Regions:
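Non-catalytic cap/lid and distal C-terminal segments of serine-dependent acyl enzymes
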Residues: 37-291
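Bacterial signal peptide processing site
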Residues: 32-34
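Positively charged n-region of N-terminal signal peptides that target proteins for export
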Residues: 2-14, 20
Length: 291
Protein backbone atom coordinates (compact mmCIF):
# COMPACT_ATOMS: atom_id res chain seq x y z
CA UNK A 1 0.00 0.00 0.00
CA UNK A 2 2.84 2.39 0.85
CA UNK A 3 4.46 1.72 -2.52
CA UNK A 4 1.20 2.54 -4.31
CA UNK A 5 0.85 5.79 -2.33
CA UNK A 6 4.43 6.77 -3.14
CA UNK A 7 3.85 6.11 -6.85
CA UNK A 8 0.65 8.18 -6.67
CA UNK A 9 2.48 11.12 -5.09
CA UNK A 10 5.23 10.98 -7.73
CA UNK A 11 2.66 10.76 -10.52
CA UNK A 12 0.76 13.78 -9.19
CA UNK A 13 3.97 15.81 -9.00
CA UNK A 14 4.77 14.95 -12.61
CA UNK A 15 1.26 15.78 -13.71
CA UNK A 16 1.36 19.12 -11.88
CA UNK A 17 4.68 19.95 -13.54
CA UNK A 18 3.29 19.17 -16.97
CA UNK A 19 0.10 21.07 -16.28
CA UNK A 20 1.69 24.25 -15.00
CA UNK A 21 4.67 24.40 -17.33
CA UNK A 22 3.01 23.13 -20.50
CA UNK A 23 -0.71 23.83 -20.44
CA UNK A 24 -0.79 27.43 -19.29
CA UNK A 25 2.35 28.69 -21.07
CA UNK A 26 0.17 29.08 -24.11
CA UNK A 27 -1.01 32.16 -25.95
CA UNK A 28 -3.83 33.14 -23.62
CA UNK A 29 -4.06 36.94 -23.47
CA UNK A 30 -3.26 37.94 -19.90
CA UNK A 31 -3.08 41.01 -17.70
CA UNK A 32 0.57 41.42 -18.63
CA UNK A 33 -0.51 41.98 -22.21
CA UNK A 34 -1.68 45.45 -21.20
CA UNK A 35 -2.99 47.92 -23.73
CA UNK A 36 -1.51 49.48 -26.80
CA UNK A 37 -1.22 53.23 -27.36
CA UNK A 38 -4.58 53.29 -29.12
CA UNK A 39 -6.29 51.69 -26.11
CA UNK A 40 -6.83 48.23 -27.62
CA UNK A 41 -5.83 45.12 -25.71
CA UNK A 42 -2.55 43.59 -26.74
CA UNK A 43 -2.54 39.81 -26.85
CA UNK A 44 0.34 37.41 -26.35
CA UNK A 45 1.12 35.83 -29.71
CA UNK A 46 3.49 33.11 -30.83
CA UNK A 47 6.11 35.75 -31.54
CA UNK A 48 6.18 36.76 -27.86
CA UNK A 49 8.44 35.19 -25.24
CA UNK A 50 5.60 33.12 -23.77
CA UNK A 51 4.42 32.14 -27.22
CA UNK A 52 7.87 30.91 -28.20
CA UNK A 53 8.11 28.89 -24.98
CA UNK A 54 4.71 27.34 -25.67
CA UNK A 55 5.76 26.47 -29.22
CA UNK A 56 8.98 24.85 -28.02
CA UNK A 57 7.12 22.83 -25.39
CA UNK A 58 4.53 21.72 -27.94
CA UNK A 59 7.30 20.45 -30.21
CA UNK A 60 9.02 18.65 -27.34
CA UNK A 61 5.84 16.98 -26.08
CA UNK A 62 5.07 15.65 -29.54
CA UNK A 63 7.93 13.21 -29.05
CA UNK A 64 7.02 9.62 -28.25
CA UNK A 65 8.17 9.80 -24.63
CA UNK A 66 8.78 12.73 -22.31
CA UNK A 67 10.26 12.11 -18.87
CA UNK A 68 10.30 14.42 -15.85
CA UNK A 69 12.10 12.92 -12.87
CA UNK A 70 11.87 15.80 -10.41
CA UNK A 71 10.39 19.26 -10.08
CA UNK A 72 13.21 21.83 -9.84
CA UNK A 73 13.51 23.11 -6.28
CA UNK A 74 13.13 26.73 -7.36
CA UNK A 75 9.50 25.97 -8.19
CA UNK A 76 8.59 24.03 -5.04
CA UNK A 77 9.99 26.25 -2.29
CA UNK A 78 7.47 28.19 -0.23
CA UNK A 79 7.50 31.90 -0.97
CA UNK A 80 7.17 34.28 1.96
CA UNK A 81 7.48 37.50 -0.01
CA UNK A 82 5.38 37.49 -3.18
CA UNK A 83 2.85 34.76 -2.48
CA UNK A 84 -0.69 34.33 -3.73
CA UNK A 85 -3.70 33.40 -1.61
CA UNK A 86 -6.20 30.55 -1.53
CA UNK A 87 -9.87 31.34 -0.94
CA UNK A 88 -12.51 28.74 -0.07
CA UNK A 89 -15.83 29.55 -1.72
CA UNK A 90 -19.41 28.31 -1.55
CA UNK A 91 -21.70 28.89 -4.50
CA UNK A 92 -25.34 28.10 -5.31
CA UNK A 93 -25.96 25.19 -7.65
CA UNK A 94 -28.43 22.36 -8.29
CA UNK A 95 -28.45 18.60 -7.95
CA UNK A 96 -28.19 17.97 -11.68
CA UNK A 97 -27.76 14.23 -11.18
CA UNK A 98 -30.95 13.58 -9.21
CA UNK A 99 -33.88 15.94 -8.68
CA UNK A 100 -32.51 19.35 -9.63
CA UNK A 101 -33.10 20.85 -6.19
CA UNK A 102 -31.06 23.81 -5.01
CA UNK A 103 -27.82 22.89 -3.24
CA UNK A 104 -24.59 24.59 -2.22
CA UNK A 105 -21.27 23.48 -3.70
CA UNK A 106 -17.73 24.32 -2.61
CA UNK A 107 -14.47 25.05 -4.38
CA UNK A 108 -11.03 26.50 -3.74
CA UNK A 109 -9.67 29.49 -5.66
CA UNK A 110 -6.04 30.51 -6.08
CA UNK A 111 -5.51 34.24 -6.50
CA UNK A 112 -2.04 35.31 -7.66
CA UNK A 113 0.15 37.70 -5.70
CA UNK A 114 -0.89 41.28 -6.34
CA UNK A 115 -4.39 40.29 -7.46
CA UNK A 116 -6.25 43.47 -8.34
CA UNK A 117 -9.73 44.31 -9.55
CA UNK A 118 -8.03 46.73 -11.94
CA UNK A 119 -6.52 43.82 -13.87
CA UNK A 120 -8.17 41.01 -15.82
CA UNK A 121 -7.10 37.41 -15.31
CA UNK A 122 -7.30 34.13 -17.18
CA UNK A 123 -8.90 31.23 -15.31
CA UNK A 124 -7.96 27.54 -15.10
CA UNK A 125 -10.62 25.09 -13.88
CA UNK A 126 -8.65 22.15 -12.47
CA UNK A 127 -10.56 18.90 -11.88
CA UNK A 128 -9.78 16.10 -9.42
CA UNK A 129 -9.84 12.30 -9.76
CA UNK A 130 -12.64 9.89 -8.87
CA UNK A 131 -11.59 9.55 -5.23
CA UNK A 132 -11.02 13.24 -4.61
CA UNK A 133 -12.88 16.48 -4.11
CA UNK A 134 -12.14 20.21 -4.21
CA UNK A 135 -9.20 19.64 -1.84
CA UNK A 136 -7.47 16.84 -3.78
CA UNK A 137 -5.02 19.16 -5.52
CA UNK A 138 -3.96 20.39 -2.09
CA UNK A 139 -5.20 23.93 -2.61
CA UNK A 140 -6.25 24.38 1.01
CA UNK A 141 -3.36 26.29 2.62
CA UNK A 142 0.07 27.84 2.06
CA UNK A 143 1.74 24.41 1.95
CA UNK A 144 -0.07 23.52 -1.27
CA UNK A 145 2.34 22.29 -3.94
CA UNK A 146 0.17 23.80 -6.66
CA UNK A 147 0.21 27.14 -4.85
CA UNK A 148 3.97 27.06 -4.35
CA UNK A 149 4.55 26.27 -8.01
CA UNK A 150 2.16 28.97 -9.12
CA UNK A 151 3.80 31.51 -6.82
CA UNK A 152 7.27 30.68 -8.12
CA UNK A 153 6.38 30.49 -11.80
CA UNK A 154 4.82 33.93 -11.48
CA UNK A 155 7.70 35.25 -9.38
CA UNK A 156 10.25 34.17 -12.00
CA UNK A 157 8.01 35.66 -14.69
CA UNK A 158 7.72 32.36 -16.52
CA UNK A 159 3.94 32.68 -16.65
CA UNK A 160 1.58 35.61 -16.38
CA UNK A 161 -0.62 35.62 -13.25
CA UNK A 162 -3.91 33.71 -13.54
CA UNK A 163 -6.64 32.29 -11.33
CA UNK A 164 -6.97 28.56 -10.54
CA UNK A 165 -10.30 27.05 -9.47
CA UNK A 166 -10.53 23.53 -8.01
CA UNK A 167 -14.20 22.50 -7.69
CA UNK A 168 -15.86 19.25 -6.66
CA UNK A 169 -16.63 17.45 -9.91
CA UNK A 170 -19.74 15.63 -8.65
CA UNK A 171 -22.91 17.53 -9.52
CA UNK A 172 -25.09 16.15 -6.76
CA UNK A 173 -25.93 16.90 -3.14
CA UNK A 174 -23.99 13.88 -1.89
CA UNK A 175 -20.65 14.86 -3.39
CA UNK A 176 -18.49 13.21 -0.73
CA UNK A 177 -15.25 11.44 -1.62
CA UNK A 178 -16.80 8.13 -0.50
CA UNK A 179 -20.35 6.88 -0.90
CA UNK A 180 -21.36 9.17 -3.77
CA UNK A 181 -22.44 8.01 -7.22
CA UNK A 182 -19.61 8.34 -9.74
CA UNK A 183 -22.17 8.89 -12.51
CA UNK A 184 -22.66 12.39 -11.11
CA UNK A 185 -19.28 13.28 -12.66
CA UNK A 186 -20.85 13.04 -16.11
CA UNK A 187 -23.39 15.84 -15.56
CA UNK A 188 -20.91 18.39 -14.20
CA UNK A 189 -21.14 20.35 -17.46
CA UNK A 190 -24.48 21.82 -16.39
CA UNK A 191 -23.06 23.04 -13.10
CA UNK A 192 -19.95 24.35 -14.80
CA UNK A 193 -21.91 26.37 -17.36
CA UNK A 194 -24.87 27.48 -15.27
CA UNK A 195 -23.37 27.99 -11.83
CA UNK A 196 -19.60 27.82 -11.32
CA UNK A 197 -18.31 29.92 -14.22
CA UNK A 198 -20.96 32.63 -13.69
CA UNK A 199 -20.07 32.74 -9.97
CA UNK A 200 -16.33 33.06 -10.62
CA UNK A 201 -16.83 35.72 -13.24
CA UNK A 202 -19.23 37.69 -11.05
CA UNK A 203 -16.91 37.67 -8.05
CA UNK A 204 -13.44 37.92 -9.58
CA UNK A 205 -11.79 40.10 -12.18
CA UNK A 206 -11.79 38.03 -15.37
CA UNK A 207 -12.36 38.65 -19.07
CA UNK A 208 -16.03 37.77 -18.66
CA UNK A 209 -18.79 39.14 -20.82
CA UNK A 210 -22.07 38.96 -18.93
CA UNK A 211 -24.10 38.68 -22.13
CA UNK A 212 -21.97 36.13 -23.97
CA UNK A 213 -19.63 33.80 -22.07
CA UNK A 214 -18.18 32.50 -25.33
CA UNK A 215 -16.45 35.82 -25.95
CA UNK A 216 -14.03 35.02 -23.13
CA UNK A 217 -13.27 31.40 -24.11
CA UNK A 218 -9.71 32.36 -25.10
CA UNK A 219 -9.17 33.24 -21.45
CA UNK A 220 -10.33 29.96 -19.92
CA UNK A 221 -8.65 26.58 -19.56
CA UNK A 222 -9.95 23.26 -18.23
CA UNK A 223 -7.74 20.41 -17.10
CA UNK A 224 -7.99 17.36 -14.90
CA UNK A 225 -6.44 14.20 -13.54
CA UNK A 226 -7.99 10.75 -14.10
CA UNK A 227 -11.77 11.26 -13.79
CA UNK A 228 -11.09 14.97 -14.13
CA UNK A 229 -9.30 14.24 -17.38
CA UNK A 230 -12.40 12.41 -18.55
CA UNK A 231 -14.46 15.47 -17.64
CA UNK A 232 -12.07 17.69 -19.57
CA UNK A 233 -12.55 15.60 -22.72
CA UNK A 234 -16.23 14.68 -22.31
CA UNK A 235 -17.46 17.96 -20.86
CA UNK A 236 -14.83 20.57 -21.65
CA UNK A 237 -14.40 19.58 -25.29
CA UNK A 238 -17.62 17.64 -25.79
CA UNK A 239 -20.10 20.05 -24.20
CA UNK A 240 -18.39 23.33 -23.38
CA UNK A 241 -15.98 24.01 -26.21
CA UNK A 242 -17.79 27.33 -26.63
CA UNK A 243 -16.53 28.27 -23.16
CA UNK A 244 -12.91 27.02 -23.27
CA UNK A 245 -9.99 27.14 -25.68
CA UNK A 246 -7.31 25.35 -23.63
CA UNK A 247 -7.45 21.78 -22.32
CA UNK A 248 -5.29 19.34 -20.39
CA UNK A 249 -6.01 15.66 -19.71
CA UNK A 250 -3.65 13.84 -17.33
CA UNK A 251 -4.03 10.05 -17.25
CA UNK A 252 -7.67 10.55 -18.18
CA UNK A 253 -10.16 7.89 -17.16
CA UNK A 254 -11.88 6.10 -20.06
CA UNK A 255 -14.49 8.45 -21.48
CA UNK A 256 -18.03 7.65 -22.55
CA UNK A 257 -17.27 9.48 -25.78
CA UNK A 258 -15.19 7.36 -28.18
CA UNK A 259 -12.41 9.17 -30.00
CA UNK A 260 -14.44 9.14 -33.21
CA UNK A 261 -17.30 11.01 -31.52
CA UNK A 262 -14.96 13.63 -30.08
CA UNK A 263 -13.29 14.04 -33.47
CA UNK A 264 -16.66 14.56 -35.14
CA UNK A 265 -17.69 17.08 -32.48
CA UNK A 266 -14.54 19.07 -33.19
CA UNK A 267 -15.08 18.84 -36.92
CA UNK A 268 -18.63 20.13 -36.63
CA UNK A 269 -17.84 22.85 -34.09
CA UNK A 270 -17.33 26.46 -35.17
CA UNK A 271 -14.85 26.80 -32.28
CA UNK A 272 -11.19 25.85 -32.49
CA UNK A 273 -8.98 24.43 -29.75
CA UNK A 274 -6.01 26.67 -29.06
CA UNK A 275 -4.06 24.04 -27.12
CA UNK A 276 -4.68 20.47 -25.90
CA UNK A 277 -2.11 18.81 -23.62
CA UNK A 278 -2.80 15.07 -23.27
CA UNK A 279 -0.44 12.98 -21.15
CA UNK A 280 -0.46 9.41 -19.84
CA UNK A 281 2.14 6.96 -18.58
CA UNK A 282 2.84 4.02 -20.88
CA UNK A 283 2.44 1.66 -17.92
CA UNK A 284 -0.96 3.02 -16.91
CA UNK A 285 -3.17 0.04 -17.74
CA UNK A 286 -6.44 1.94 -17.26
CA UNK A 287 -5.84 5.38 -18.69
CA UNK A 288 -3.41 4.57 -21.50
CA UNK A 289 -6.10 3.29 -23.87
CA UNK A 290 -8.17 6.44 -23.40
CA UNK A 291 -5.19 8.70 -24.09
Amino acid sequence: MEDREEIWIVMKKRVITGMLISLILCTMTACAGGKTNNGTEEGIGMESNEGMIAKAIAQETNQEHVSVDAIPEKYTKKRTDEAGTIVHISYPSKDYFLDGKAITKEANVYLPYGYSEDCKYNVLYLMHGIGGDEAEWGMVDDDSLVKRMMDNLIYYKEITPFIVVTPNGRSTENCAREGSDFNSFYVFGKELRNDLIPYIEANYSTYADADNMSLAREHRAMAGLSMGGMQTINIGIGECIDLFSYFGAFSAAPTSNPAEKTAQLLKDSPYEIAYFYNICGTEDEIAYDSA
